[in-house]
Each structure stands twice: as C-alpha cells, then as structure tokens.
Design a protein with these regions (language model features):
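Juxtamembrane and boundary regions of transmembrane helices in multi-pass small-molecule transporters
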Residues: 2-7, 12-24, 29-86, 235-294
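Short helix-coil transition sites and intra-membrane helix breaks within transmembrane domains
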Residues: 11-21, 113-115, 159-167, 197-210, ...
C-alpha cells in the first residue's frame, strides 16, 4: 500500500501532467514571467525522482518488511493473465498511439511553438473522432471539468492579484522576517514551511493556489534564481502529499483500505517526508545547475 502511494507521489513530481495542481503551478508561474515546459519539468525532475524510486522502496522495506518475500509463480500468473486478456483491441492501439503522440508533442512544444493545452485538446479530439471516447465519457470526468473550470478562474484571480500588487506586498511581508539571510537559506526555509504547511490543507490545489506564488516571490526577492525557486516549490507541491492520510485523493483512498494503521501511516510519512526534502534540497538543485537551468 505504501509503496504504491509513494510511487504516485514520485511520479506526480516527475511529470508536469501527472497531478492537477501541477497545471495550476505552470499557470501561476507564467503570471510571474516564468515559463515551465513539459520537457523542462521532466528534465529537472528525472534524476532526483529516479533516485527516490530506489531509496523509497528500500526505506519502506526496512521499516516494514513484507510478509511474502518470494513469488516464484509470478511470471506464470502474469503470462496466464495476458493470454486471458487476448490481443490488443483496435481502440487500445489507437489510445496507445495518441498517448505517444501527445507525449512527443508536449516534449517538443517549445520547438514547435505550440501550447500544452492545444496538444491536450488535439488528443481528446482524436480519441473522439476514432470512437475511443464518447461525449458521455467526457461528461463523466467530473474531476477534469472541475480543474478546467476552476483553473481559469484561479489563474485570472492570480493575475489580478499580481497586477494589484497584493502578491508583491505579501512576498515583502514574508521576506521581512527572513531579511539579511542568504537566498539559499531562505529558499530552504520556504520549502520546509511550504511542505509542512500541508498539514493544514486537505487539498493540494488549495494549498498551491494560496501559497505557491507568494513563496516563489519571496525566494526571488531574496535573490534566488527564478526557475530554481519555481521548480523546487513545484516539486514540493507533489511531495507534500507524504504528510498525512488526507493529504490528497490517493492518500484518502489507500488509507481507508485498512492495510496500514493511521499511526503507522503518519510515522512512515514523517520519515519519508524527511527523505523527500533532503533529496529535493540537495540533489535537485545540483542537477538543475549541471543542466544549466539556473
């Protein structure tokens, strides 16, 4: 249960399109003249996330060793299941092709000069044209409609607040408490505060909407490189799900399954939260420096 949950957290930090609040982050960053592309996000996250894919299962294994450590019949069971499923259907092949096309276009969006939203609408249109999806399928995706509707409102509000100077004022107010400190220390403190502030939120989108822009503004005003501050706090918006059993949707679902007691969930989350922070406070900035992102 915990390995599955933390795999979800790591992939949410790894891919821009893996988590709904990530799209909010990209939009908020754009209001601050910081452009984050799909490929740029992935390039910045790939090394720290791959490292976490190795470290996190190891820590979980040491803290809670599995009851079953050998599965000699796993391959036979998998082969049998594949035979029962049969060959890929035409609709499944079309879905795979559209998925690959979408990822390629997202990766090349800067080169081709196209927006990520255009690619998303293109993919949906192709799936509708070829009958892979129906309008009924689209209407039933209430979560996606919520993001689509509220994202535009939130982006508009963020832009207006920025124009009115509220974000700048809030950034200066927070920065006054960190006055005189090196930008490295300021950014580290902001990341820790941003991470643990999620104990007060049950929604990552609400957290991002409330705190992301002001915290990035404070970091930049302290002298931190804009892209570095934007990306580290973006990653923090994904890994902060490792705080509680109500931190995001998957946490609530998996915690309610009953496989992990609430006390064990909080204990494991605290330990892994420290690991996430260490990796994204050390490995991520160094890697982004190597690839020239700041």
């Amino acid at each position: 249960t915990f390995s599955e949950f933390n795999s979800n957290i790591i992939t949410s930090a790894m891919f821009m399109t893996a988590l709904a609040p990530n799209l909010v982050i990209v939009a908020l960053a754009k209001t601050m003249k910081i452009h984050i592309s799909w490929l740029g996000w992935f390039t910045a996250s790939v090394v720290p996330c791959l490292l976490l894919f190795i470290l996190v299962p190891f820590v979980i294994y040491k803290m809670y060793p599995p009851e079953i450590k050998e599965t000699p019949n796993a391959r036979e069971w998998a082969d049998k299941s594949l035979r029962e499923m049969g060959p890929m259907k035409v609709s499944e092949k079309i879905m795979a092709g559209v998925f690959i096309l979408t990822i390629v276009l997202w990766m090349m969006s800067n080169t081709l000069g196209i927006e990520a939203s255009f690619v998303a609408f293109l993919a949906i249109s192709l799936l509708l044209i070829f009958g892979v999806l129906t309008t009924k399928d689209l209407l039933s995706e209430t979560g996606a409609w919520n993001v689509l509707i509220w994202l535009s409102i939130l982006v508009f509000m963020a832009g207006e607040l920025s124009e009115m100077g509220l974000i700048k004022w809030l950034s200066k107010s927070i920065a006054s408490g960190l006055h005189g400190m090196n930008w490295v220390a300021v950014l580290a403190i902001l990341m820790v505060i941003y991470f643990y502030a999620h104990y007060l939120f049950a929604s990552a989108t609400a957290h991002v909407t409330a705190l992301y822009a002001p915290f990035v503004g404070v970091a930049i005003s302290a002298g931190a490189p804009a892209m570095l501050a934007a990306m580290l706090l973006a990653f923090c918006s994904a890994i902060m799900a490792s705080t509680t059993h109500y931190a995001n949707g998957p946490a609530s679902i998996l915690a309610s399954s009953g496989y992990v007691k609430q006390g064990e969930w909080w204990r494991m989350s605290f330990v892994l939260g420290l690991l996430y922070l260490v990796v994204f406070l050390t490995v991520a900035p160094l890697w982004m420096k190597v690839i020239g992102m700041w």
